[in-house]
């Protein structure tokens, strides 16, 4: 009696590749590919893809030297073999953060929880360091606690204003060239000069109901369904972790 071996099955035969597309806010919208099991029975591959979060180096999206920042993109819609994503957060690499911390300077951190003009609730974290003043002889640049409080108050004020007056897409456009960071650095000069001012992290806490038309517009596409609610659309969801 001979033992018949089991037929080897290639696991990739049951899987399908999808292209990941970033919003048109970025220079390079092609992120890469992702795998998912093919639809079978009650299992839907498109449903399995929705909600996936992809972490991408910002330098790959802007084709510039932004390798120290990571962007999170969330899969919101699948059309054909293409995944349409939306901004889901941003963070610094740990080695970049460590390189900023040095001796003889004060660290200033601030964070705010703000709703954008299109109802996304974000928590934005900013970081800055004191620098030597003009004609300063002393090596250290430590600031008094009262000065640090003033600087932090100004940082919170600018973060709140910039986020609340922008849509998520507009805010992303400000984050890429660090427009907000430069505004903080400029506005705090009269209080205490700063250096290495950065928006180091952005967390998405809550998102509005899903709108296909808005997503297509974000990707530079048109749709007859623009402005209509999708059947069985998402409710406001508080994300536990990012």
UniProtKB/Swiss-Prot annotation:
Family: Belongs to the eukaryotic ribosomal protein eS1 family.
Lineage: Eukaryota, Fungi, Dikarya, Ascomycota, Saccharomycotina
Locations listed in the record: Cytoplasm
This protein's record includes keyword Methyltransferase: no
A GO molecular function held by the record: structural constituent of ribosome
Pfam families cross-referenced by the UniProt entry: Ribosomal_S3Ae
GO terms for biological process, alphabetical: translation
InterPro entries, per database record: Ribosomal_eS1, Ribosomal_eS1_euk
Protein name: Small ribosomal subunit protein eS1
Keywords tagged on the record: Cytoplasm, Ribonucleoprotein, Ribosomal protein
SMART domains recorded: Ribosomal_S3Ae
GO cellular component, one term: cytosolic small ribosomal subunit
Subunit comment: Component of the small ribosomal subunit. Mature ribosomes consist of a small (40S) and a large (60S) subunit. The 40S subunit contains about 33 different proteins and 1 molecule of RNA (18S). The 60S subunit contains about 49 different proteins and 3 molecules of RNA (25S, 5.8S and 5S).
């Amino acid at each position: 009696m001979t033992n018949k071996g089991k037929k080897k099955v290639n696991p990739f035969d049951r899987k399908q590749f999808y292209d990941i597309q970033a919003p048109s806010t970025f220079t390079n919208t092609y992120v890469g590919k992702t795998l998912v099991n093919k639809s079978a029975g009650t299992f839907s591959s498109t449903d399995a893809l929705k909600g996936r979060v992809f972490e991408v180096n910002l330098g790959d999206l802007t084709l510039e030297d932004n390798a120290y920042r990571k962007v999170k993109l969330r899969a919101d819609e699948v059309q054909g073999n293409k995944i349409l994503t939306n901004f889901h957060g941003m963070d610094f690499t740990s080695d970049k953060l460590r390189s900023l911390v040095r001796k003889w300077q004060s660290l200033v951190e601030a964070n705010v929880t703000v709703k954008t003009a299109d109802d996304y609730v974000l928590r934005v974290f900013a970081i800055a360091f004191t620098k030597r003043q003009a004609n300063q002889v002393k090596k250290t640049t430590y600031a008094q606690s009262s000065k640090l409080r003033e600087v932090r108050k100004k940082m919170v004020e600018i973060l709140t204003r910039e986020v609340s007056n922008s849509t998520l897409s507009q805010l992303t456009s400000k984050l890429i060239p660090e427009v907000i960071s430069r505004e903080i650095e400029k506005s705090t000069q009269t209080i205490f000069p700063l250096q290495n001012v950065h928006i180091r992290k952005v967390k998405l806490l809550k998102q509005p109901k899903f709108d296909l038309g808005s997503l297509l517009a974000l990707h530079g596409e048109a749709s007859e369904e623009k402005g209509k609610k999708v059947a069985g659309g998402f409710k406001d969801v508080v994300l536990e972790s990012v």
